[in-house]
Structure formats: structure tokens, C-alpha cells
Amino acid sequence: MLARPTLVIALLATSVNMSPSSQEAWTPVTIPPDALRAHVQALAGEIGERNTFRPQALRRAADYIERAWRTQGYAVTRQEYALGPDTWANLEITRRGRENPDDVILVGAHYDSVIGSPGANDNATGVAALLELSRLAAARAQGKTVRFVAFVNEEPPHFQTAQMGSHVYAKQARARGDRIRAMLSLETLGYYSEASGSQVFPFPSVLYRLFYPDRGNFVLFVSNLGSRPLLRQAVESFRAQSDFPVESIATFELVPGVDWSDHGSFWAEGYPALMVTDTALYRYPYYHTEQDTPEKVNYGALARVVDGLAGMLWALGR
């Protein structure tokens, strides 16, 4: 997951400040918080910890996602790969574009959890958002093709290795010549607070406070320098469709932590990609613990974030 940049020059030079811009007509949607709650409860409450050390639970999570997508009317593709004696799978669905079907907008979230944690916020919230965004997309054909992918094995010990699900996916996409115009990684999205001091920062924290709020009430968009045009378009589109607070940062890939999720796999293959997050360990006190349980998630705030993401996705996919 995410760590904010520790290089002050990176923050000063590349933090992105944007104002809303007009978009073409979009019918606003309201995601029911209870729909998101049901997904998080199923994954983190009923299935619980899900990783290669609990293989049955990890497969149950994959089956849950596949059933949800089939119910929405999609054909589900499993991208399987071997890891030791077992086989694991990324799951993919596609809403083919009308005018520019070879141009792809990809939305992804990992469905495994870290060892010892039921993974409600990290990352059942990301999967819940993924499932609700795909449900909306099923009824709205766009100019570009939109893919939704549930990635396996994002967490350690597979993180940033050749066995990481998104690494396998991105590498094969590049080998096929896929024209992925934007990749959006939905990562740890469900914890928000209006309390002063609820948002913390890495050293030197005093400088970060010059640019970012000390209340953890916002969603953060993160990009590398090469993805700045995508970041600008995404944040402007989000703000045009939602009044939920959003902050953004574009910085160097060498800054520790900036590539700590599935978007990093796409940067490695030269694709433009963003992470959308609540900032995880810099706000969420239960990050990577056994206390990361469904009741910790702010479902009302999460629903507002997904509302904004739905409008943003529509704008990117035109």
C-alpha cells in the first residue's frame, strides 16, 4: 500500500492542484451504502482472512466475485497461473466500447488480504467498489472498452514479485499489445474521519501539512510523473461529479511506497496508472491487523466516493 513521498522536493514540485471542469451530461448515480456493506461483510466477515496460506478462503473470495459478475450479466475470464503446487487466478470482465474498442480503461482491486487480517478495508472495500462500478457499467456502453479486474496475491509474500497477480496481468497485457489508456487501482477506500489530527504523515510531517489537510476526510489519487495527464483528467472528472473531498499527488517512482499496490505493476510496463485510496496506514489504525473488520468501514462515505468514481469512469471511457 501507500506511503507518502519522503522527498520534500518531490512534494513541492509535483503536488497537483486542480479545479473542477465541466463535463458532458452524466446522470448522477447513488450507490446504496448497504450494497457496499454486503460485499464487505461477505468477503471480510464471512470468508475472512484470504490468502495463499488460507487457500480455501481465497478461492471462496474468487467464487464470490465471479458469481456477482455473472449475476450482472458478464462473461468472466479467469487468468490462471501456477504458484508452487497451486493455481491462482485474476478475474476479468469486459464492457466493450463502441467507437474505440481497442482503447482500454482498466479498473482493478486485489481480493486477497494480508496474513492475519480479515481485510475489510484492505481490500474488501476496493472489491466492493469494483463490483458496484461494474454493475453500473453493464447498463452504459461507452466509446472505449472498460475492463474490470480482480487481482489475486497483492499482499506479502507475493507483493512486488513475479507472482503478484497484477504483475502477471500487466506483463501479459504488454506482450499482447493491449492499449490500456488508464489503469485505476482501488485500494483501501473505506475509512474517513472529521477529527483534527486524524490524518498523519511521514517525516517530515510539518511540510506535508502545508499542502494537505490534517483531517482524514478525503480520498487521495496517486500517480507517477508519467501519469500526470491521467491524474489531472481523473481528478477533474471526479470533482465535476462529486463534492466528496479529493486530494492528489504526482511524484517520482523512486519515492518509497508510491507504487505499493497493483498500479505499480502497470507503471513497470509503461502504462498510465493511478491509485485511489484513503491513505491506509496514514489514517487507518487497524491497517494490516486482525481488527480490520467490516464495522470499521464508513459505508456512507465509501458510497459517496464510488458515486464520484462512477462519473469519473464514464468521463474517462467516452
Regions found by a protein language model. Give the residues of each.
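Acidic/histidine-rich catalytic neighborhood of metal-dependent amide-processing enzymes
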Residues: 114-232, 258
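Proline/glycine-enriched tight loop/beta-turn segments at coil->beta junctions
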Residues: 98-104
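A non-catalytic alpha/beta surface segment that caps or lines the substrate-entry region
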Residues: 38-98, 247-249
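Second-shell loop/turn segments in exported
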Residues: 24-31, 45-56, 77-82, 113-123, ...
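N-terminal capping segment at the start of a domain
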Residues: 14-60, 72, 112, 282-292
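Active-site-proximal beta-strand/loop segments in catalytic clefts of secreted hydrolases
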Residues: 43, 79-81, 95-97, 108-112, ...
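Extracytoplasmic/secreted proteins, especially bacterial periplasmic and envelope-associated proteins
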Residues: 35-38, 42, 56, 60-71, ...
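Active-site-adjacent substrate-binding region
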Residues: 182, 189, 193-318
